Amino acid sequence: MTTVDEVVRATIARRGPIPIEEVVELALYHPQAGFYASGGRAGRAGDFLTSPEVGPLFGAVIARSLDTWWREAGEPQTFVVVEAGAGPGTLARAVLAAEPACARALRYVLVERSAAQRALHAEHLALEDASEAFASMPDVDGDHEGSSAGMPPGPIVVSLADLPRLPGPSVVLANELLDNLPFGLAEQTETGWAEVRLALDGGSLVEVLVPAQAFPEVAVAVGARVPVAAAVNVWVREAIELAGPGGRVVAIDYAASSADLAARPWTDWVRTYRRHERGDAPFELLGTQDITCEVALDQIVPGPTVSTQADWLRRHGIEDLVAEGRRIWHERAAIGDLAAVRARSRIVEAEALLDPAGLGAFQVLEWPGS
């Protein structure tokens, strides 16, 4: 089978040096040889851990937040949640297992561009055909109660390759998706910004600088690099439009300003993961390791509400769930049944999710739909 390395080399031989954004796109999402197509995934048996893989507590908190937003919306009979970058469906399973109050109204859409990851959804989730699941949804300006008559009760779960186009407000969730979108690299030189590209030199892949077509508006030292977050900005705009008036976009990820990123070594904020080992050569082993890049906040749609994951989880009730877990554990520890084990697990999971030196330091970005 053709490898990503071979595809990149052939592309350079044909066109000359290619943008880093294109290299990352091929490395992660090439339909046959890309990282996700060839088995790369989150999870303890995969290549990296995200909050949903820590355990079901994260999904239980998300379920509580969905209930809050559903009630704020007046408890509509149809409540659409779109999880973008759903991976193997771990978060969706945890949300549904928490049995949120909005379940009967819930239309949960998993969006995952990797066919290999998407194929895993049906293994643990009862999926419905999208055309049937949303055929009777109300129009944007329609009456929820009247228009939803005859719709089957939720939760209805759908798996798609791309963001859908649905009427009415939606909640769009993205956990560690933005850092997995293709990104460019810009470097400050004596004469201004230059774009970093990948070229061939004597059979080796090397970085070269070419005049930048667009560059970040930030003053940094010569030699400093910043990401170019054009693809992230496009995705956020599309998600805000999908959420619609009354909806919201919630993205959880690594994030910092371009100036802060420029002050650090670029290989500190461009990360690679393979079998839970972090690497330091993003453009080697193409297609066999995950490549992520911290989100440059000042380069994307302005105005999000920003909080740390730790603060956000506390605001949405994680401590109540942990207290409930402690109570169940004390009541059932002597029995040692599954309920006791799950309850005890909440305490351990919360420590990881709230860790200020780890997952708790992630940024939660929230935009209103429009």
Residue ranges of predicted features:
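Rossmann-like AdoMet
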Residues: 1-84, 88-162, 166, 317-320, ...
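Generic recognition of stable, solvent-exposed alpha-helical segments in well-folded globular domains
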Residues: 3, 18-22, 53, 57, ...
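A residue-level signal for conserved active-site and pocket-lining positions in enzyme catalytic cores
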Residues: 27, 172, 300
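Short, glycine/acidic-enriched loop or turn micro-motifs at the edges of active sites
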Residues: 86, 115, 178, 256, ...
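Conserved protein kinase catalytic core
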Residues: 118, 181-182, 259
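A short SAM/SAH-binding and catalytic strip from SAM-dependent methyltransferases
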Residues: 158-190, 226-230, 234, 238-243, ...
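A mobile, often basic/glycine-rich helix-loop segment
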Residues: 170-220, 263-273
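Long, Lys/Arg- and hydrophobic-enriched amphipathic alpha-helices
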Residues: 214-370
